[in-house]
Amino acid sequence: MINIPKGTKDVLPSESYKWHYVERIARETADLYCLNEIRTPTFEHTELFLRGVGDTTDIVNKEMYTFRDKGDRSITLKPEGTSGVARSFIENGLFNGAMPLKMYYITPVFRYENPQKGRLREHHQFGVEVYGGAGADTDAEVIKLAYTVLKKCGLSVKLYINSMGCPDCRKKYNEALKGYFADKLDKLCPTCRERYYKN
């Protein structure tokens, strides 16, 4: 008998109604916020994720399902939804249309993680991307949409809002952080040391 691959799960008829319920709430809420659905391929060229996610992240270094296809191209099962949407936005010239362009997706994503209870290698992600919307009002709208979806699903939600700051502030913060760790590198794990030098 052939068993299901490690880190995956069958959605059986006895529980698929729960998936339909959550997906319906996500879609209906996205519709209320005037978002249109976008569907991108389940796999993309690996280079897209190296650029989009960053070559120093755990996703790229440890968690991607990457393989060579019959044409010897490096292909990756998408580990997240944003990169494929950004590629589609550029490749299909969506920037030439009316702005802001607000899109959502519900898609499977894949991460090569250590499977544990509640942690699988195939996930399903609901995501929102807004192009051409500037300022905090766009961020607030996306946060409100996510909050609404979670509340409609019956979850108790408490929001804590933070900011990465402006590019100047981030640069100063990174410099201060690197300064703090400069004399502690021997105490860091190999991955953290690598990030110290790459970031």
Region locations from a protein language model:
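Extended, charged alpha-beta segments that form solvent-exposed binding/catalytic grooves
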Residues: 1-199
